[in-house]
Every structure is written in C-alpha cells, then in structure tokens.
A protein has these predicted regions:
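Subtilisin-like serine protease catalytic core
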Residues: 1-255, 327-334, 356-360, 403-415
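Solvent-exposed loop/turn segments at secondary-structure junctions
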Residues: 38-39, 230, 249-253, 279-283, ...
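Gly/Ser-rich catalytic serine loop of serine hydrolases
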Residues: 209-221, 308-310, 379-393
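C-terminal subdomain of the subtilisin-like protease fold in secreted/lumenal serine endopeptidases
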Residues: 267-269, 273-276, 287, 333-337, ...
C-alpha cells in the first residue's frame, strides 16, 4: 500500500505547522477526526441507538401525551421509540446469548492454544481438516475450531483471524446485552474534546491516521488500490489511484459530525471517489451529513457506500448514510449503495448477511472471503462484509475514471449500474431461508460486471472538465467466457 498512499503536496510532515492553512496541522497522509490534541485516539465506541435511548429516556421514558408535543418533539419521540425497541429487544436477545458465547469463546481460545502447540502456530480450516489428533483433548480442540471456521464460512482464513472475529462478535453482543441498563460511556468526548453540537467547531483531531485500529481501513484500501503486478500479496482493482486516509469510524457506531467533516475534507483535498465502508441505523445529525453529500455532488465527487450486514431490507429499515436528502425530499445523484454477493461454491450469489433493497441498494459486488492487505508489514488476510463489497465498486469507479477522467460522477455511476449483470436465478434471500429472484434485491437486479461497465464508459462523451492527462486507453485481452 505504501506506494499508493496520498500525500498532501502542500504539507510538510511532522513540523507542527499548518503549512497549507486548511486548519489541520501536519495532515500529510490525511486526517484523524477521532484523535485528541494530546495524541490519544478513540478506539471503541457505543451504538448510536444506545446513545439516543439514554439521552432521550429522561424526557420520553414515561407516559407521553403525543398531542401536546411540538413537531420537533414528535420527531424526537419517534426516534426514542425506535431506539427503545432496538435496545430493549436487542438487549434481551443478546443477554440470552452472552453466557453461551462467553463459554464458547473461552473454549475456542483454549482449543486454539492446544492446536498451536500440537499442530502448528498458524493454520486455516483446510489445514486443520488434515490434523490427526493423538488423544481426545486434541480431537476436541480440532472439532471446536473447525466448527468456528465453518460457522464463519471462512475455511481459508487463519486461526488468529477467526479468533479475532469471534472475539469482536462476542464483545459486540456483550455491549448489546448491557445497553438497556447502562448508559454508554462518552468515549469520543473524553478524547476529542470538541464542542460536538457546534458544526463550526471543526478543526479537531490529529494526523495519526493509523491510530490503534487499522485493520478495517487497511483491508479496504488494499481491495481498491494495492500495488499491482509487483508479485507481492494481492493486486488492487485499480491502477493510478491514491488512497487518502481519513479516520472517522471507531469500533462501534460513527458520529455524524465526524462523517460530514470527513466527506468535506476529502472533497476539499481533491478526492474524486469516497469509499464509505460503514453504517448505522440512526443518524441524529443527518442534516450535517446530507449537506456534505450535496457538497460532494456539487464538486463532482462519487460516494460509494456499504449497504450493511444485518440481512435486512433497507427499503423498509433505515440505514445511514444514504442518498435521501431529508429536508428537500430529493435523492443525491452521486451515491452508490452496494450489497455483498456471496461465494456460489459455498452458498449463493447473495451473501446471507447482506442488506438488500429494490429501491435503496444499487448493485451487488463480491463481499465474501475477500483476501487483501492487513496491518503487519506485507501481511494479508481474509475478511467479509459489505465493507469489502463497497471498495470493489469504488475500485472499478477509480479504474473507469483513470482512463476516462472526463466522465462525471453520475456517468461513472451510470456505467457501473448499466453494466451490472442479472444472473436470472433465484437465491436464498439474506437473513432468511426462502428463495427469491436475485433481481429483487437491488435497483439494477445485478452483479457488478467490470468488463461491461468499462465497455459502456468507452462510448460516453464526458461531462467533466479535465485538468490532467488521462491514462493511456486500455487494450486488455479479455476472455469473454470469464468476464465480470
């Protein structure tokens, strides 16, 4: 990734001076909106539903006469009731699982330790199948870890990755279990120390874009732009790309102010495509994000967003950010929402965790067993989620723009959507056991098809003013039987 990282040409790194006078000191590689001026960084955070539930509970937790509420209060009450339903139902459900998950996590950790000693320090599920246990203890360890690999449907992943994934899931369920009883800690406020509710207080954070939780961003970045054809690790989707690193999402739900300012920062510093591999079910300061989306649209910047991993229909379940501009009831034209397609060899064309929606999801792209860069120095691993599908689309958008820079954001979106391939088959609907036409899961009804999208791009007359020379026209040798 090092060769493809964006570097701010107007900033001298580590000199303690805001050389480009944009308000962000030493933003050479980008900016961290989750940092404090003292160098500390926000690592984890709470769920937005929990934040809203506990903030509004003193006002709306008892008996409420809706007829006496103002319009603003009615909207607050609606949000509270929705958050209350999510938190109280989710908490009850999680509480029933936590004891079992804690026991299974402890058992899995012990099993992994046994296998590291008796088998080998690093192994994947396929390796483990070949292990010959010498006794019942070893056999139990093998059985426990194999169940975990198969449960995550990632037999190619390493043992350390699987244990880490399970730990993350277990801790998330613990948070949900306690959410109805305990008000969440203000992780962000204790470190960032801005006036959160003043949008003009925007020059906060620090330049430490790696911070303490770089796995997700590193994996996503590699999918888009890992250096190609160097014989090392993986090839990103696109050449001639620079990754501008902006940290605005913790291990937990992001805050709307950070997202809005991150979008504006990217636009102001020349980004043409913004990948957004994050999301949540509540957006109390949606207007700030909507304004940033409109700002990006006015500057010709394409936004690519992950649809989410709840196995839900987002036509009827809210998911943020989204292209729906609340105050004008219009839809942003520079916004693509991406669902995750699965591995046909192991399950189906739609990943079982992916959100979907005939109106709100635009296209599906690969999001299961995606191999990419991870922190650690030329280290690689698997991950899955719509967070992995979104950068596949962002990478294709970057590829198209690198050869056809005169195309507008809307034209690139058109190429991607028009080129999507409808498999004309029924698949298991995410989050269920019933089958439906794959075409019902998105606006295009299709899977991303790079070959077709690039062919369409070649036919369009661009609408964007070009300030630099385009890349040479591609002349790939395409095996049409394997296109897409």
């Amino acid at each position: 990734l090092k060769p493809v990282l964006w570097r701010n040409p107007k900033e001298i790194p580590n000199n303690g001076i805001d050389d480009d006078k944009n308000g962000y000191v030493d933003d050479y590689f980008g900016w961290n909106f989750l940092g404090g001026k003292d160098g500390r960084n926000v690592k984890e955070d709470s769920y937005e539903a929990a934040r809203l539930y506990h903030a509004l509970k003193p006002k709306y937790g008892g008996t409420v006469d809706e007829s006496k509420l103002s319009a603003i209060e009615k909207e607050e009450y609606r949000i509270f009731k929705k958050a209350q339903g999510d938190i109280e139902h989710g908490s009850t459900e999680a509480q029933s699982q936590v004891l079992f998950l804690r026991s299974l996590y402890n058992k899995s950790s012990i099993a992994d330790s046994v296998l590291k000693e008796k088998f080998k320090p690093e192994y994947n599920g396929n390796d483990l199948v070949t292990f010959k246990p010498a006794n019942s203890k070893d056999a139990d360890a093998k059985s426990t870890m194999l169940a975990l690999f198969r449960g995550f449907e990632m037999m190619d992943a390493t043992n350390d990755f699987i244990i880490k994934e399970f730990s993350s899931y277990f801790k998330g369920q613990e948070k949900k279990a306690e959410a109805s009883q305990i008000a969440p800690k203000d992780y962000r406020g204790e470190i960032v120390k801005d006036n959160y509710y003043d949008f003009n207080d925007r020059f906060y954070g620090n330049p430490d874009v790696m911070a303490s939780t770089p796995f997700h961003g590193t994996h996503v970045s590699g999918i888009i732009a890992a250096a190609r054809n160097n014989g090392i690790g993986v090839d990103g989707v696109a050449n001639d790309v620079r990754i501008m690193s902006i940290r605005a999402v913790p291990d937990g739900d992001e805050h709307d102010k950070d997202i809005a300012l991150a979008i504006r920062y990217a636009v102001d510093n020349g980004a043409k495509i913004i990948n957004m591999s994050f999301g949540k079910s509540f957006s109390p300061q949606k207007k700030w994000v909507d304004d940033a989306v409109r700002y990006a649209q006015s500057k010709g910047v394409l936004l690519v967003h992950a649809a989410g991993n709840d196995g839900k229909n987002v036509d009827s379940t809210e998911n943020f950010p989204n292209p729906n501009i609340a105050d004008t009831k219009t839809k942003a034209t520079n916004f693509i929402t991406v669902g995750a397609s699965g591995d046909p060899k192991t399950g189906g064309l739609a990943a079982d965790f992916s959100n979907y929606g005939k109106k709100e999801v635009d296209v599906f792209a690969p999001g299961v067993k995606i191999y990419s860069t991870i922190p650690g120095g030329n280290t690689y691993g698997f991950a899955q989620g719509t967070s992995m599908a979104s950068p596949v689309v962002a990478g294709l958008a970057a590829f198209i723009l690198s050869y056809y820079p005169e195309l507008s954001a809307e034209q690139v979106k058109y190429c991607i959507e028009k080129g999507a391939q409808n498999p004309n088959t029924q698949v298991v609907k995410p989050g269920s056991t019933t089958k439906e036409d794959f075409a019902n899961f998105s606006r295009t009804g299709g899977l991303l098809n790079a070959y077709e999208s690039i062919k369409i791009a070649a036919t369009l007359k661009g609408e964007r003013k070009v300030l630099s020379n385009p890349a040479p026209q591609p002349k790939p040798k395409v095996n049409k039987s394997k296109k897409g």
